[in-house]
């Protein structure tokens, strides 16, 4: 039975929706007929006016009858024009009312749609979702920190290695400065000494080494002063 009542209800709603459209169609049809009558009466008025002018000097009775018919047509034309104006106003009023009704129906549908959407959402659900997002973001941050700290632990740097590397770098810079000034390292000077007796070689090597060291120290002091 509900389906039957729904069918009848649906037809009733459709009829209510079609009522203004049918009314507008009927009014426009009547307006079209009146506009045709307006043109016909205007032609009749022009025709009777021409007859009256034609017979005004030769046949006054005919001219008078033509003028009488002209007045009758003019009266009918005035009525027709009044009816046309009334119909046009009525059509505009129904069209405006129909637009208002359709606008209201559209707004009702929009309100129902928003009600359906908000019916599935509550402040508690939104807060719960946001809490879950914050928890997951915090968990992700903890995971990243754990991975990063683990990598840093596996790549621990020995301070002794750093000291050795710094000493090597300082030695390289010192060698470069010596090469630029034309004075070779002490070890190279010893290797270039001529062959001699063991005792003499040791004595000369010691003397050369001391002289070279003093010269090197003076050169470094001079460079530092600059």
UniProtKB/Swiss-Prot annotation:
Record's GO cellular component, any one?
cytosol
Coiled coil listed as a keyword: yes
**Keyword Aminoacyl-tRNA synthetase among UniProt keywords:** no
- Coiled-coil intervals, chain numbering: 24-226
Chain spans, region Disordered: 197-216
Q: Which UniProt keywords apply?
A: Coiled coil, Cytoplasm, Endosome, Membrane
- Look up and give the membrane topology term: Peripheral membrane protein
Compartments where located: Cytoplasm; Endosome membrane
Source superkingdom: Eukaryota
| GO terms classed as biological process | ATP export; intralumenal vesicle formation; peroxisome organization; protein transport to vacuole involved in ubiquitin-dependent protein catabolic process via the multivesicular body sorting pathway; reticulophagy
GO MF terms here are: identical protein binding
Q: What family classification does the UniProt entry report for this protein?
A: Belongs to the SNF7 family.
Subunit and partners: A component of the endosomal sorting required for transport complex III (ESCRT-III).
* Protein function: Required for the sorting and concentration of proteins resulting in the entry of these proteins into the invaginating vesicles of the multivesicular body (MVB). Also required for the proteolytic cleavage of the transcription factor RIM101 in response to alkaline ambient pH.
The name under which this protein is listed is: Vacuolar-sorting protein SNF7
């Amino acid at each position: 039975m509900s389906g039957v009542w729904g069918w009848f209800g649906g037809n009733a709603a459709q009829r209510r929706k079609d009522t203004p459209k049918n009314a507008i169609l009927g009014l426009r049809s009547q307006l079209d007929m009146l506009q045709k009558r307006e043109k016909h009466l205007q032609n009749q008025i022009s025709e009777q006016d021409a007859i009256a002018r034609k017979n005004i000097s030769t046949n006054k009775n005919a001219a008078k009858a033509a003028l009488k018919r002209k007045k009758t047509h003019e009266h009918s034309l005035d009525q027709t024009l009044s009816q046309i104006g009334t119909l046009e106003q009525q059509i505009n009023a129904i069209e405006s009312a129909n637009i208002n009704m359709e606008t209201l129906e559209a707004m009702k549908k929009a309100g129902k749609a928003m009600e359906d959407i908000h019916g599935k959402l509550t402040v508690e659900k939104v807060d719960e979702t946001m809490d879950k997002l914050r928890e997951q973001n915090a968990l992700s941050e903890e995971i990243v920190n754990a991975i990063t700290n683990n990598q840093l632990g596996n790549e621990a740097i020995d301070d002794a290695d750093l000291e050795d590397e710094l000493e090597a770098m300082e030695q390289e810079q010192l060698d470069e400065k010596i090469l630029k000034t034309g004075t070779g390292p002490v070890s190279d000077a010893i290797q270039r000494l001529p062959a001699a007796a063991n005792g003499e070689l040791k004595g000369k090597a010691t003397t050369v080494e001391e002289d070279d060291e003093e010269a090197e120290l003076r050169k470094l002091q001079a460079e530092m002063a600059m």
